[in-house]
Amino acid sequence: MSIALLGLDNSAVSTNLDDADYLERELDLLWKEQDSAGKKIFLTRVNQRLPELEYLFRDAASPLDLHWTLLAAISYQESHWNPQAISKTGVRGLMMLTQTTAKEVGITKRTDPKQSVVGGSIYLQKLINNLPESVPRQDRLWMAIAAYNLGFSYLTEARQITKKMNKDPENWDDVREILLFLTKNSTDHLMKVRIKEAVNYVQKVQLYYQTLSVIKRDKEI
């Protein structure tokens, strides 16, 4: 059985599920360039926190064109699956929604786990839908996730600049390249930090999503 994962490099993913060491080997490959402490914390929270929340991600993803492990990955990046999480800027809850976003998606209590996950999933789907249908599905997904962190207007501006620089505004890798280029040429320190955070945000979500996909598929086999 193949373990092809949406939009990610699967060259290192084994198809030999009879190998007893398969899961450990795949996780080692996925995290080989990552902080080992971060891996340990993530896997610990997969065991300790995710079981109580998994049904929320599954339920929220079900009516949408999303997979529950993707919502779970975004939530981990946002809050480490802590329903009471709050940032210095005032965003809070499992999906770290702003007050404005919460109102937009009909959420009244951001620290309520179910409301937060439902609200975050609706908001993500809106971001996906706001991108042109001509953008390939995988690229729309990564761009929407970048916009979840950075803001849709900044993503739109980055795509416009990508086109002006003769790159493909419908390809996430090209847009990401331009975002990083902008950080080298901007005098706005705060914006440089935000852009770098957004690019790193997508990379982390991809890592957590791929890790969860490997773990959960292994358990379902």
Write out the residue ranges for each language-model feature:
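Catalytic and substrate-binding regions of cell-wall glycan-acting enzymes that process beta-1,4-linked
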Residues: 18, 22-30, 144-215
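Second-shell loop/turn segments in exported
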Residues: 40-48, 57-62, 82-85, 103-113, ...
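Substrate-binding/active-site groove segments that recognize
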Residues: 84-108, 115-126, 181, 205
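Short, functionally critical alpha-helical segments immediately adjacent to catalytic or ligand/cofactor-binding
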Residues: 58, 65-82, 117-121, 144-150, ...
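Extracytoplasmic
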Residues: 52, 66-71, 76, 89-92, ...
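Short, solvent-exposed mixed-charge patches
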Residues: 220-221
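N-terminal export signals and maturation junctions of secreted/periplasmic proteins
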Residues: 2-58, 83
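Secretory-pathway/luminal and periplasmic proteins that interact with or process carbohydrate-rich
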Residues: 79-88, 127-130, 150-165
